[in-house]
Amino acid sequence: MASQPKSFEEQLAKLQEIVTKLQQGNVSLNDSIELFKEGMTLSNDLKGQLNEAETTLAQMMDENGQLHPAEEKGDDVSNNGVQNQGYKSQFLDGDVF
């Protein structure tokens, strides 16, 4: 079996190609089984990618469908889960130099 295409669109096109071959019915039983396995793997990978995209979009939107602004530096997200402890850089004051 060849390596799977990388992009979502390439994987989807390959899955559509497999489905078409299986629907045509002119494939041997053994080849059908292999195509089915490959198709299921692609289907699961695609479903995972869609779930990740949906989660990402849901995290960016509030309950009213409004887009959240990008996270600012110093928040818990950009610090790997560590909250900003109130540190203020001396370079932000402007009167260092």
Swiss-Prot record:
EC number(s) given by UniProt: 3.1.11.6
The family this protein is said to belong to: Belongs to the XseB family.
Molecular function terms, GO-annotated: exodeoxyribonuclease VII activity
Name this polypeptide is given: Exodeoxyribonuclease 7 small subunit
Catalytic reaction equation(s): Exonucleolytic cleavage in either 5'- to 3'- or 3'- to 5'-direction to yield nucleoside 5'-phosphates
Bias-annotated ranges (Polar residues): 77-88
Species per Swiss-Prot/TrEMBL record: Limosilactobacillus fermentum (strain NBRC 3956 / LMG 18251) (Lactobacillus fermentum)
Main subcellular location of this protein, as a coarse class: cytoplasm
Lineage: Bacteria, Bacillati, Bacillota, Bacilli, Lactobacillales
InterPro entries, alphabetized: Exonuc_VII_S, Exonuc_VII_ssu_sf
Subcellular location(s) of the protein: Cytoplasm
Gene: xseB
Top-level enzyme category: hydrolase
Function text: Bidirectionally degrades single-stranded DNA into large acid-insoluble oligonucleotides, which are then degraded further into small acid-soluble oligonucleotides.
Gene3D superfamilies documented for this protein: Exonuclease VII, small subunit
Region (Disordered): 64-97
Entry keyword set: Cytoplasm, Exonuclease, Hydrolase, Nuclease
